[in-house]
Amino acid sequence: MKILNSPKEAINYTKSLNGSIGFVPTMGALHEGHLSLIEKARKENDYVIVSIFVNPTQFLPGEDLDKYPRRLEADFEICKRAGVDAVFTPTPENMYSNDEVLIKAPKIKGYILEGFNRPGHFDGVLQVVNKLFNIIRPTRAYFGKKDAQQLYLIKQMVNNFFFDIEIVECETKREKDGLALSSRNIYLSEEERKRALSISKALKRAAKLSSKTKNIEEIEKEMLEILDVDELQYIAFVDRDFNHIDEIKPGNTIILLAAKVGSTRLIDNIWI
């Protein structure tokens, strides 16, 4: 397995390959969710490249940039065992210049929900993903459905910038008890983790109710009765194009939820 430390190294490496490239961009602290993306990429491509980069431009002031879990050697071992061909580990210094050409998230759909609660977050996400796509030039790139709004915006960017890349949507990976896997779960105390389960339980209940009623107010009311969080930031009902909807549309509805349990911010969703 090759370790690529700079954009130039990565560009030269990918130019030398003859075959399809599956790309899994990550911020490290790899877990089973990341592994499921890597495994899917491994099955569908001749080569698999994983990037590990804690991207500073997608963190807001006061967020967890400094304490975000970093365990590079353990991540390398996970990648090696999973059959990854190369890991790209750039630094902020070789990814960004002092005079950046900035990419901005769409004015409406980039600034609702996650974009409203974390203003500027998606500017940073799209900026770095655009750079990574230009460096790696993958055939396919793999993203989890847990970050549904991010997934939607990346697909829009791919269309807008005419990238010849297939974006592969991957199901959210969960613990046996239903908690959506996240690198930030390590921040949760035992008591907080138990309460965090109320998020997936509320979403599961919403999905079950949606087969009986299309009434969003009724579904949201039941979700609120289940939730046991310290700060509910939003419950939202949207279609696959992130337009707000007035009633459940079977096959074209995503229910999204963001909340803090203790000081840890968690997001989850369910596609109906």
UniProtKB/Swiss-Prot annotation:
Keywords: ATP-binding, Cytoplasm, Ligase, Nucleotide-binding, Pantothenate biosynthesis. Beta-alanine binds at Q58. The keyword Hydrolase does not apply. Catalyzes the condensation of pantoate with beta-alanine in an ATP-dependent reaction via a pantoyl-adenylate intermediate. GO terms for molecular function: ATP binding; pantoate-beta-alanine ligase activity. ATP binds at residues 27-34, 144-147, 181-184. The active site is at H34. It comes from Nautilia profundicola (strain ATCC BAA-1463 / DSM 18972 / AmH). InterPro entries: Cyt_trans-like, Pantoate_ligase, Pantoate_ligase_C, Rossmann-like_a/b/a_fold. This is Pantothenate synthetase. GO terms for cellular component: cytosol. The reaction proceeds by a bi uni uni bi ping pong mechanism. GO terms for biological process: pantothenate biosynthetic process. The keyword Protease does not apply. Belongs to the pantothenate synthetase family. Homodimer. (R)-pantoate binds at Q58, Q150. Its main location: cytoplasm. It catalyses: (R)-pantoate + beta-alanine + ATP = (R)-pantothenate + AMP + diphosphate + H(+). It comes from the Bacteria. It is found in: Cytoplasm. Pfam families: Pantoate_ligase. Pathway: Cofactor biosynthesis; (R)-pantothenate biosynthesis; (R)-pantothenate from (R)-pantoate and beta-alanine: step 1/1. Its EC number is 6.3.2.1.
